[in-house]
From Swiss-Prot:
Residues 124-135, 167-185 have a biased composition (Polar residues). Residues 1-194, 214-313, 325-355 are annotated as: Disordered. It comes from Dictyostelium discoideum (Social amoeba). PROSITE patterns: GATA_ZN_FINGER_2. GO terms for biological process: regulation of DNA-templated transcription. This is GATA zinc finger domain-containing protein 15. Gene3D superfamilies: Erythroid Transcription Factor GATA-1, subunit A (3.30.50.10). Residues 1-111, 136-166, 214-309, 337-351 have a biased composition (Low complexity). The gene is gtaO. It comes from the Eukaryota.
């Protein structure tokens, strides 16, 4: 018994999830158990055995798990040697991810393709034809299939070249059952590759045919991020358990249809979706095709069913008021639902109001609507009470708008220039240790209570002294000089004998 376990892990391994512990047993029963440490994900357990009876039992257990366990994503591919081909699709309904297992080594080949109708991401889906196989062809023995990727060595993969103008199958049609014919749904650069071991129990050509026929149409990369687990079952006890994990937000969501990198609002597990995401087992031998409706939406609207942004919370339906048989009656007041919806300006430079503020103004305006209805029914608009109510509502709305303007308008540029900038004070005395005569410019404080020296214009002084006006308007130095000069003048005036013959008072003061 050969157990071929392939684990493709993108980027880092030092993360929170210990995933994909593949136990390789030496028994004849091939059980590839994926022990996932995720609490919510016990996914993709592939029980492959040689007995047809065990496969039938596993299928019954899988149906019970898919129907009863809404919190577990159980997609078990259990068809190895049966004549019935069960295609278990792990449907990621948020990203339209289809995991389809093709067991073509049985008598009946049933290939099921689950498409998304007219989705813009699937406009480039192409059909890849089956590889030509020959028993003597050495290339085909090493031929491996891969989804289109740029990070894969060319020595392991040989991807067929196909033209974009190749004819596509219709979205709802089942492709012809000719071995490994599948559609390339890979739109991203995530890699899914398969590596082959030589089987000692089957010939080289038979192994190649079975490997190519059992290729899983593995839509790992239908949308922006896919974490899909794909099972590739090969006959004669060859179990290819491919565990693919995409690196999402520094953690591995392995064996998990759990989308963290999608642009949608819902993180959906297979059986845990609010959008009716079902794990469908497709039995093609019974001609029962269960189409999952969540993967057949035109624009993937199932991911936006819970979007509250599409609701017009403050929209008012149209109001039609019957007209009275009067000589003059105004036309009925109609309010369109879209006219009262607060619109956010698209210009980046325009001030954007918060939803709370815009809704408050909208409520103030909408309160006027019933009053306008009553006024339209009145004769001649002579009801003063209704007019007063309207005036009050308008005043409240205007008051609120003015408050918003005060907060939204830019502040006025403050003028820091003062009148005292233009004032100059001429020195009445030469300053100490200063031999030049320069006009001293000093700033006068805007505070009228602050004292300024009237002679030199200083504001700081240890003591304020009396000036010519009789008040303490001079600083300490100017006050002392003024007092000394005045005292000397008084002494000379009181004693005329001390005055020289050719000396006058003004000459003394100037000296």
């Amino acid at each position: 018994t050969n157990n071929n376990n392939f684990n493709n892990i993108n980027n880092n391994n030092n993360n929170n999830n210990n995933n994909n512990n593949n136990n390789n047993n030496n028994n004849n029963n091939n059980n590839n158990n994926n022990n996932n440490s995720n609490n919510n994900n016990n996914n993709n357990n592939n029980y492959n055995s040689n007995n047809n009876n065990n496969n039938n039992n596993n299928n019954n257990n899988n149906n019970n798990n898919n129907n009863n366990n809404n919190n577990n994503n159980n997609n078990n591919n259990n068809n190895n040697n049966n004549n019935n081909n069960n295609n278990n699709n792990n449907n990621n309904n948020n990203n339209n991810n289809n995991n389809t297992s093709f067991n073509d080594n049985c008598n009946n080949n049933s290939n099921y393709h689950n498409h998304s109708n007219h989705h813009p991401l699937f406009e480039s889906l192409q059909n890849i034809n089956q590889y030509p196989l020959s028993p003597n062809n050495n290339k085909s023995s090493n031929q491996h299939l891969s989804h289109s990727s740029s990070n894969v060595n060319s020595q392991y993969y040989q991807t067929p070249y196909y033209q974009p103008s190749q004819k596509q199958n219709s979205p709802n049609s089942t492709p012809p059952l000719n071995g490994c014919q599948y559609e390339n749904h890979n739109l991203n650069s995530n890699n899914t590759f398969f590596k082959k071991n030589t089987n000692h129990y089957i010939s080289q050509q038979l192994y190649q045919q079975q490997f190519n026929q059992n290729v899983n149409n593995n839509n790992n990369n239908n949308n922006i991020s896919n974490n899909n687990n794909n099972s590739y079952n090969i006959n004669c006890n060859n179990n290819n358990n491919n565990n693919n994990s995409n690196y999402n937000n520094n953690s591995y969501n392995n064996n998990n249809n759990y989308n963290n990198n999608n642009n949608n609002n819902n993180n959906n597990n297979n059986n845990n979706n609010n959008n009716n995401n079902n794990n469908n087992i497709f039995n093609e031998n019974n001609n029962n095709n269960n189409n999952n409706n969540n993967n057949n939406n035109n624009n993937c609207n199932n991911n936006y069913n819970n979007n509250d942004n599409n609701e017009n919370k403050y929209c008012v339906p149209k109001i039609e008021i019957p007209q009275k048989n009067l000589q003059y009656s105004p036309p009925p007041f109609q309010l369109d639902s879209g006219s009262t919806t607060p619109k956010t300006p698209s210009a980046p430079t325009s001030p954007v109001l918060s939803p709370k503020t815009s809704n408050k103004i909208c409520d103030l305006v909408l309160n006027i609507v019933p009053i306008c209805q009553e006024l339209s029914n009145e004769d001649g608009y002579q009801n003063k009470e209704l007019l007063n109510k309207i005036q009050e509502y308008f005043e409240d709305a205007i008051r609120e708008i003015k408050k918003i303007k005060k907060t939204r308008l830019p502040l006025m540029k403050q003028n820091h220039t003062k009148e005292s900038d233009d004032k100059t004070f001429y020195s009445l005395r030469p300053r100490r240790n200063r031999k030049c005569t320069i006009k001293t410019k000093t700033l006068q404080s805007s505070n009228s209570e602050e004292i300024v020296c009237q002679a030199c214009g200083t504001r700081a002084s240890p003591e304020w002294r009396k000036g010519p006006d009789g008040f303490k308007s001079l600083c300490n130095a100017c006050g002392l000089y003024y007092a000394k000069t005045k005292k000397r003048e008084n002494e000379i005036i009181g004693q005329p004998d001390l005055i020289p013959k050719h000396m006058k008072i003004h000459n003394l003061i100037n000296d």
